[in-house]
Amino acid sequence: MILSKEKINNYAAYLYIKVAYDEAHNKMAHTVYFTNFYRSSKPLFLDEEDPINPCFQTISMGGGYVSGEVYRSDFEVEANARCIITTQSSAKAYKAVDGKTSEQHTNITLGKNSILEYISDNVIVYEDGKFAQFNNFKMDSTATLIYTECFGPGWSPHGSAYQYEKMYLNTKIYYDNKLVLFDNLKFQPRKNDESAFGIMDGYHYCGTMIVINQEVVEEDVIKIRDLVKEKYPDMDMIFGVSRMDIPGLGLRVLANTYYHVEKINAVAHDYFRRKLFNKKPLILRKP
């Protein structure tokens, strides 16, 4: 449900997208509302095998998060509806002023038999930046979720990585109102050696993919591992794939470029589009 105007005013920018299935006309009806410099594209139809499946690109007109700004987005995919949501480009968090943290809050609700492919670009935190991201998913057990995220350090005049002050990623997934995933990543390189073994292992980018669907089984975990090793045997990265307690899995990648993270996530995404939807790989046509 869209926030009241009084609550919307608490945020520097707000974006709301709702997608519902119009059975009478066999199409996806949508509602989009935004304020200030947070935007969404009109629905794009990039899935050539599914011409009624809309794709929305979220757009930050301000160029990035300035110290202390708080953004919020609410996405609803109703029963039997489906859509793709992606960012237009990387999100950027700049130098914190007066110790203030920039924040992004995203709340996503998935109804019965709904499908959401939420493919977000990386978050880049620059020197002296402080950024926190909070993602809350509430999904029906019959819904399908494919979600990606990534973060990495921005350019520094000193030429070294890990110059940001804080990077915090908090993701919660509720499955039939039960908390089934709580991913809590907090990086403070001025307090801890983030490049150390057991944290980032010397890599700069950390990517995550979550896939939840009733048809995900243990064999898929093994298959993804084998496909990645087969396709990128010499890539400088490390990755892991684990099955969740519900029908789903998580993929995590550590690499030195976002390009490498994207490539690994694409292996899993392509595999599940074939298995779950009988579709070809998704081409988002972003530069």
From Swiss-Prot:
Keywords: Chaperone, Cytoplasm, Nickel insertion. This is Urease accessory protein UreD. Belongs to the UreD family. GO terms for molecular function: nickel cation binding. It comes from the Bacteria. GO terms for cellular component: cytoplasm. The gene is ureD. It is found in: Cytoplasm. Required for maturation of urease via the functional incorporation of the urease nickel metallocenter. It comes from Ureaplasma urealyticum serovar 10 (strain ATCC 33699 / Western). UreD, UreF and UreG form a complex that acts as a GTP-hydrolysis-dependent molecular chaperone, activating the urease apoprotein by helping to assemble the nickel containing metallocenter of UreC. The UreE protein probably delivers the nickel.
